[in-house]
Amino acid sequence: MKQEEAKLELDKLNSQIQHHDFLYYTQDNPQITDAEYDVLCHKRNLILESFPELASNNNYQDNVGSTPDAKFAKVKHAEKMLSLDNAFNQQDIEKFITRTKKLLDMDNSQSIAISCELKIDGLSFSVIYKKGEISQASTRGNGYFGENITNNVKTIKNLPHTIQNAPDSLEVRGEIYIDRSDFIQLNKDGNNFANPRNAAAGSVRQLDINITAQRKLKYFMYTIVNTKCLTQEETLNQLKTLGFCVNEHTITTNNIEDALNFYNQFYNNRSNISYDIDGIIYKVNDIKSQHILGATNKSPRWAIAYKFPAAEAKTLVNKISIQIGRTGVLTPIAELSPINIGGVIVTRASLHNKSEIERKDIREGDYVIVKRAGDVIPQVVDVDKNLRAQELTKFIFPTTCPSCGSNLFQAEQEVSIYCTGELFCKNQILEKIKHFVSKDAFNIIGFGKKQLLFFYEQGLITNIVDIFTLEEKISNSDLKLESLHGWGEKSIHNLFSAINNSKTISLENFIFALGIRFVGKYIAKILAKHFLSYEKWYHEMLRLAQDENYLLNIQQIGHKTIHSLKMFFTEQHNLDTINNLVRHLTITDAKTTSHLSLLHGKTIVFTGELSNMSRHEAKTKSETAGAKVSSSLSKNTDFLIVGNNPGSKYKKAQSLNIQILTEDLWLQYISPNTNEN
């Protein structure tokens, strides 16, 4: 390749990389896999190695991430947020070690301590504390400037808002992520994220922080900017002491074989971890050596990321079917010829949405590249159009719901398309009924998935109203329930008793039970406390058809939630279902408090078994009293409530000087000052 050709190819690669950086970092919507992106970068680096004179005019090679999104305020990083160079094989790691020793004037026979950490597949962020209080949080952005996400980050559970004994100024950096199980539930609840990383990034970069607050975001911190610690190992321990979440899977070793075994261990067992990782990060452990090694404009010389290879394979799309979730989102699914990917037989893959099918032009009969994204959810990443038969036609996305025929709706600036049939749509019904009887809704004990499926298949429960006429239907039918396997007189009696007991329900739980898109437990509670009675709430929901802006006066209710409520209450099927449902129910008014409890605004944690109620009931009572209930202790915990046989949290609370309450004392704290109307 001549230099002129190399320059043209370099410009082309830079343009492609810049485009995909924007999609990944700013839009949270990557269109190629990590492996494909790495190939582009590798090609660019090969050209620069062969033609170093082109490097001086190749400004884009120094970029990190992408330009901050204009919808967020810009934040200048005091210390540039660098990305890491990648290694793709064992030889790259060996070269990294050799090069590091050479730069440190070490003999190659000398050992060097390396910190080995998991590479979390999430969103990099920085948090600055001033005099122990959160002052600012930001994304990486382009490395020089990030996006101000302070209010969004404050909603992340277990992130300290206040740090005791902190220096006047402290900057920590880490990775925001979401567990795979929470990601799956998020998509079941009406979202359509491609993978957990996109879900985490999209959740953090919401203009409406109430949406961020509803997402179960987590984080790990991995560094302190300008740390006074002597080693990376010491830095991680210091972060723990300050109350931050730090990943437990780390080792420090002088042996390269141990470092590579660490990689192999997690590559082979990463599906056993609850969150996505996409490699291992190796860092020189000694901080002084890190300073000596320094950094290029893009990445530190003292660290490298050893990426996991993508698990991909090619197979045939036999059919494209449409799956309808609980909240009505239509998700296209590729029905595949069985293929082994990473030891797992894959027969179906997500196509995400209509836009994704159109962009990739995926057709029934195509040969496609399938990747197990995050080792869990297979997705189609590309089409081999060289193998496409001429007679294959474009896939036509349905214009009405394939299940119930209701209208489809697509919100502005959203890729998800969903059915407006809600409580009428057959494909949504079973999932909605499961949600309806769940613990935070009607809490009908003994109504598990198997029982629901049985009654559904028998035609006895085809909508949520049928639950409350089930006993009458069975008594008037030829079905002898007690004679069937798994049913006895006691279990039947308990089920019908649970159904009858659930007929009195709080307004908050009733609203949540309806399973309206974007109306989770938190929003249901806000709506209930605002309208107080069912009659008032229902009347105001009907107003949405004429005027949806009035709901904006309710703090923490955003445009997406309002529009979702409007779509629900303008569908006559849903109104008919609600009106039939309330005939069987007593919906109690929301409770108001005229005095604050002693726990109002406090963070509490429970340990041990409670004598008077379940942990779930205790959590509900505490939250009603204004407390925040956490599952883990930190310096930000105000009280530990101790039941019988307390666990290790009891000793930890003592060491952190956290106030300890007995169950009886806790009951006094939430009761005496609370006056319920």
UniProtKB/Swiss-Prot annotation:
Which GO MF term does the entry hold, naming one? metal ion binding
Entry EC number(s): 6.5.1.2
- Cite the source lineage: Bacteria, Pseudomonadati, Pseudomonadota, Alphaproteobacteria, Rickettsiales
Gene designation per UniProt = ligA
Task: Spell out the CDD domains in the cross-references.
Answer: BRCT_DNA_ligase_like, LIGANc
Q: Which InterPro entries match?
A: BRCT_dom, BRCT_dom_sf, DisA/LigA_HHH, DNA_ligase, DNAligase_adenylation, DNAligase_N, NA-bd_OB-fold, NAD_DNA_ligase_OB
Give the binding site residues for Zn(2+): C401, C404, C419, C425
Task: Look up the record and name the cofactor or cofactors this protein needs.
Answer: Mg(2+); Mn(2+)
Pfam families cross-referenced by the UniProt entry:
BRCT, DNA_ligase_aden, DNA_ligase_OB, DNA_ligase_ZBD, HHH_2, Nlig-Ia
Q: What is this protein called?
A: DNA ligase
